[in-house]
């Protein structure tokens, strides 16, 4: 999966699948981002406690403006990083953003299992967002690999401050 000097090898075929599907989903990213997070909380209700803005909130998740803002931001960043993966040969999220993401995920105790739940929720959200004839093993693998690359980049930054 990785080439010399840490460059990511993401095939043209996978890139084409990601770009084609992202073009369809991008128009509805606010709604899809929220659906993505609702799936995470459906699978792992305790994950709500990892988000300070949800801990003491009585606002239903579906209408929580802070969750909506966070959800679209995460969904768009994830999809844009996937779309740029082949061309850039690496995750294109700014280094400062990756450091912040790594620090935040470390602070809130995010573990491998959380990333797995998020991966499953992302793939299910994408599957539901696309026409049925577009979704299949190739599409699942393309998005799964792109997500795994993003997670690997975040995990690289999940180190306690020295």
Curated annotation (Swiss-Prot):
Induction remark: Under anaerobic conditions.
Site (Homodimerization): 140
A Pfam family assignment: Globin
Motif (Homodimerization): 42-46, 112-124
Cofactor(s) the protein requires to work: heme b
Note describing how the cofactor binds: Binds 1 heme group per subunit.
The UniProt record lists the keyword Cytoplasm: yes
GO molecular function: heme binding; metal ion binding; oxidoreductase activity; oxygen binding
Chemical reaction(s) catalysed: Fe(III)-heme b-[protein] + nitric oxide + H2O = Fe(II)-heme b-[protein] + nitrite + 2 H(+)
Keyword entries, A-Z: Cytoplasm, Heme, Iron, Metal-binding, Nucleus, Oxidoreductase
Annotated Gene Ontology cellular component terms: cytoplasm; nucleus
Domain Globin: 9-159
Residues involved in heme b binding: 66, 70, 100, 104-105
EC class of the enzyme, as a word: oxidoreductase
Annotated localization: Cytoplasm; Nucleus
Reported tissue expression: Seeds and roots.
Its EC number(s): 1.7.2.-
InterPro entries linked: Globin (IPR000971), Globin-like_sf (IPR009050), Globin/Proto (IPR012292), Leghaemoglobin-like (IPR001032), Leghaemoglobin_Fe_BS (IPR019824)
Keyword Cytoplasm: yes
CDD domains registered for this protein in UniProt: class1_nsHb-like
Function: Phytoglobin that reduces nitrite to nitric oxide (NO) under anoxic conditions (e.g. during flooding or in waterlogged soil). May not function as an oxygen storage or transport protein. Has an unusually high affinity for O(2) through an hexacoordinate heme iron because of a very low dissociation constant.
Family that this chain belongs to: Belongs to the plant globin family.
SUBUNIT field: Homodimer.
The name this protein goes by in its record: Anaerobic nitrite reductase GLB1
Source organism of this protein record: Hordeum vulgare
Name of the coding gene: HB
């Amino acid at each position: 999966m990785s080439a010399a000097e840490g460059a990511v090898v993401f095939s043209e075929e996978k890139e084409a699948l990601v770009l084609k599907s992202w073009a369809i989903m991008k128009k509805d990213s606010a709604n899809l981002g929220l659906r993505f997070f609702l799936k995470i909380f459906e699978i792992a209700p305790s994950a709500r406690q990892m988000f300070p803005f949800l801990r003491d909130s009585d606002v239903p998740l579906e209408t929580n403006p802070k969750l909506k803002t966070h959800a679209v931001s995460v969904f768009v960043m994830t999809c844009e990083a996937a779309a740029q993966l082949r061309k850039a040969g690496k995750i294109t999220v700014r280094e400062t953003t990756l450091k912040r993401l790594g620090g935040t995920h470390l602070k809130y105790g995010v573990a491998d299992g959380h990333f797995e739940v998020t991966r499953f929720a992302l793939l299910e959200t994408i599957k539901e967002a696309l026409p049925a004839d577009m979704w299949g093993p190739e599409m699942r693998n393309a998005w799964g690999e792109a997500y795994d690359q993003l997670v690997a980049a975040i995990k690289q930054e999940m180190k306690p401050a020295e």
